[in-house]
Structures are given as structure tokens and as C-alpha cells.
């Protein structure tokens, strides 16, 4: 871990203060007439993959602040209330280089000095995609861990070659201590190899994961492809979007690491088995409507509902979907366990095969990031498009809403 010293000087030199730059516009409105009821005191924090930067912009596309990370972004950014920013960056010589790989986490202070930097990348694992900063000061993130062909076979994997199963890691970034960990391979069921302990009927085990659901369509080892996580600290639950399963999984975070490797313990009594799952009941041979086809950003709303971006919902057309989630969660074999869809938005012009997400704004509107096109949408509850803005950034991971009363703005000198 690096803390201040030379590293902070280099970061300070490579980062550019937005308030010292000329007010550049970074895109244009697609239709100026579609700006009727937007809150003009709202700003947008854009994770710009195409330029490996982050930008704070307004509705007119004026850039108020810019972070140039002197490295490749990979993928998420978090702006904290004190003006500091946490960013995921790509590690050199990462063991797994699938889309969204990272391996480095950096916290940059409001004055652009480096607070800390940690690496979670080795010949056997690589952090990727997403990170959250918890109220206890820890970070929680996604990571691939490599299993050899022999190790995969021992778990009943029907394919051949290396596989990259998913883990979730909570780390103290100041000490680099791993304080909690969850591993999907502890929660597998498979009906391929009856000599293995995890052999069973997939449909009878809705809280476990069918290891072989994607093997026939994936030859690169990336079987699951987690790409987003959200932590509900009040209820100690983790929500993850599982792209290649077209699902959202819900995992108990109240467990110890030992309990997380089992099927007992924790507030919800399931250990690390899935507390809930939805979006594609075909993954566990169950009944119910399939509502997701590739999915990004599990965004928990204040109401307890969840917003997601369904990338491939229609033929070359995406959809944003809001699910009503009602606890206590229950997964019953042979029963429709899918939640109710309470809101959705789609448009024939909106399509991104990857990346992307949606945020519910204070005025009730929804901000949508069409990631692979670099386009931002603001839509009302009834589907009216209030703002449609094509940025100059060709690839956006996500866009976060920042309000004018956010103390981060003052900390940044804005």
C-alpha cells in the first residue's frame, strides 16, 4: 500500500483541476425541446472508459471538474462526501483480463493527493468491475479466482480448461486485511458428475448455483461475469448482477467468512447460499417469467426496490427495469419466485450490449446511462424523455447523480 509520499506527488501532477480549466462542453443535446422539467442544479459524475477519466458535468455538457487517473480505468468510481474519489484501475500483468478487469483501488483526496492505493491482483486472482466504500471504511469488491482444469473437474464442471469463478471480498484498505470473503464455488450444485459431493438435482436446490449453466456457450472460463454490486448495509445484504446468468443474486453479508463458505449461519440462516435470486428462473430449472437478458448495475432505491439495466432485453434494444423487492425473501423449488416489475422504460434508440445503468433522481425522474454509445437519458415516470444528451465520451461505465447541496462539491472548490 502506498500512502502519500512520492505517489501523491505523481497523482497530483497527473490530475487536472476542473475549476482551473476552461469550461469545455463535452457533448450536445439530441433534442433541445426535451428539457422541460429537469432540475438544472443537478450534476453528473461520468466514469469515462474511453479516455480513462472521470468528469463532473452539468446539463449543458460543461465540464466542472476532471480527474485524469494516469492509468486505465477498470471500471467504477465513487465520489465521497469529503470530495475524495475512489477509483478502480487496471493492474499490469493481470491474471484475468476479461472485460471489466481491474486489480487496483485508489483513493484520491479532494486536494488531489493520494490517500491510499491497494492492489488485489496476482497470478491467481484479479479484482474487477465494481467497488463500494462501506460506512466502516472498508471496501467491498468483486474478484475472479482462477481454478485449474483439474480443480474445475473436481467440482463437476462439464467443460474443459481454466475457469474464473467469482468471489466477493471485503478489505480494510489501510491494513490490506481481508475481513470477509464469499466464494461462489462453495455454493455449487451440478447434475453432470454423480461422483462429486455437490451432485444433485438443480431444480431442487434454488439457493445454490448450477455450475454448468453456461459452460456450453463459454469457452473462456468466465462462467458467471459478475459486473455490479450494491450493499444494503441496513439489512446486511449484497446484491450482485450476474451477467451471463441474466440474474440478480442476493447474498447474506452478516455471516462470518467461515459461515459464508457454508449453507448455515447469518441473519438469514443460509450461510453463503443465495438468499434470493431473480431475473432468469431458467438458471435453476424453475417456473416464472424471464425478465432479464444480460444485466448491469443493481441499484437499490430508498423504497427498497431495485433498478437494473437489461442490456439485451429486446433485439438490439435495452430496457431499464424496476423490481419491487419484498422481504422476507423466499426461494421455493417449483414455485414462481420472481418479483413484480413495477416500472420500466425502453426506446428503440436505446441499446448498449454492455456497461450502462440507471439512477432514480430526487425529482422522481430516472437517469439512464447508455454506456456503449456515451448517451445520457432523463425520463419521467410516464416515460417522457426530458433530456437526451450525447456526450463526447464513446464508452461510459456509469453516470452518478450529484446534487448541488452535496458537500463534495464545496470540498472540490466548486
Please identify what each model-predicted range represents.
Residues 23-414:
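Histidine-/acidic-rich catalytic cores in large beta-rich domains
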Residues 12-18, 81, 333:
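Generic detector of low-complexity/intrinsically disordered segments
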Amino acid at each position: 500500500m502506498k500512502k502519500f509520499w512520492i505517489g501523491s506527488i505523481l497523482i497530483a501532477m497527473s490530475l487536472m483541476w476542473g475549476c482551473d480549466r476552461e469550461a469545455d462542453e463535452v457533448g450536445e443535446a439530441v433534442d433541445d425541446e426535451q428539457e422541460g422539467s429537469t432540475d438544472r442544479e443537478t450534476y453528473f459524475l461520468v466514469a469515462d472508459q474511453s479516455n480513462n477519466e472521470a468528469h463532473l458535468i452539468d446539463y449543458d455538457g460543461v465540464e466542472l471538474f476532471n480527474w485524469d487517473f494516469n492509468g486505465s480505468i477498470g471500471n467504477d468510481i465513487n465520489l465521497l462526501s469529503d470530495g475524495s474519489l475512489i477509483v478502480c484501475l487496471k493492474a499490469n500483468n493481470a491474471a484475468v483480463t476479461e472485460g471489466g478487469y481491474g486489480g487496483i483501488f485508489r483513493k484520491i483526496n479532494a486536494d488531489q493527493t493520494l490517500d491510499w492505493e491497494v492492489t488485489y491482483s496476482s497470478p491467481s486472482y484479479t479484482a474487477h468491475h465494481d467497488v463500494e466504500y462501506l460506512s466502516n471504511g472498508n471496501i467491498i469488491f468483486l474478484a475472479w479466482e482462477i481454478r485449474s482444469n483439474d480443480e474445475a473437474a473436481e467440482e463437476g464442471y462439464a467443460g474443459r480448461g481454466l475457469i474464473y469463478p467469482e468471489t466477493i471480498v471485503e478489505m480494510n484498505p489501510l491494513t490490506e486485511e481481508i475481513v470477509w470473503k464469499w466464494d461462489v464455488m462453495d455454493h455449487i450444485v451440478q447434475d453432470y458428475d454423480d461422483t462429486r459431493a455437490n451432485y444433485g438435482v438443480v431444480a431442487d436446490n434454488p439457493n445454490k448455483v448450477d455450475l454448468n449453466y453456461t459452460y456450453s456457450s463459454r469457452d473462456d472460463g468466465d462462467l458467471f461475469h459478475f459486473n455490479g454490486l450494491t450493499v444494503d448495509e441496513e439489512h446486511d445484504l449484497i446484491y450482485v448482477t450476474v451477467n451471463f446468468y441474466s440474474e440478480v443474486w442476493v447474498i447474506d453479508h452478516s455471516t462470518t467468512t467461515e459461515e459464508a463458505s457454508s449453507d448455515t449461519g447469518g441473519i438469514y440462516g443460509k450461510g453463503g447460499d443465495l438468499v434470493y435470486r431473480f431475473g432468469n428462473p431458467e438458471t435453476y430449472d424453475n417456473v416464472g417469467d424471464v425478465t432479464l437478458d444480460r444485466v448491469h448495475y443493481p441499484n437499490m432505491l430508498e423504497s427498497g426496490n431495485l433498478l437494473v439495466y437489461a442490456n439485451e432485453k429486446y433485439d438490439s434494444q435495452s430496457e431499464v427495469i424496476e423490481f419491487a423487492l419484498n422481504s422476507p425473501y423466499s426461494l421455493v423449488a417449483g414455485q414462481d419466485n420472481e418479483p413484480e416489475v413495477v416500472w420500466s422504460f425502453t426506446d428503440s434508440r436505446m441499446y448498449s450490449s454492455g456497461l450502462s445503468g440507471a439512477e432514480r433522481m430526487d425529482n422522481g425522474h430516472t437517469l439512464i446511462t447508455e454506456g456503449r454509445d456515451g448517451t445520457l437519458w432523463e425520463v419521467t415516470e410516464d416515460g417522457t424523455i426530458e433530456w437526451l444528451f450525447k456526450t463526447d465520451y464513446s464508452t461510459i461505465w456509469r453516470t452518478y447523480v450529484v446534487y448541488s447541496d452535496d458537500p463534495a462539491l464545496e470540498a472540490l472548490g466548486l
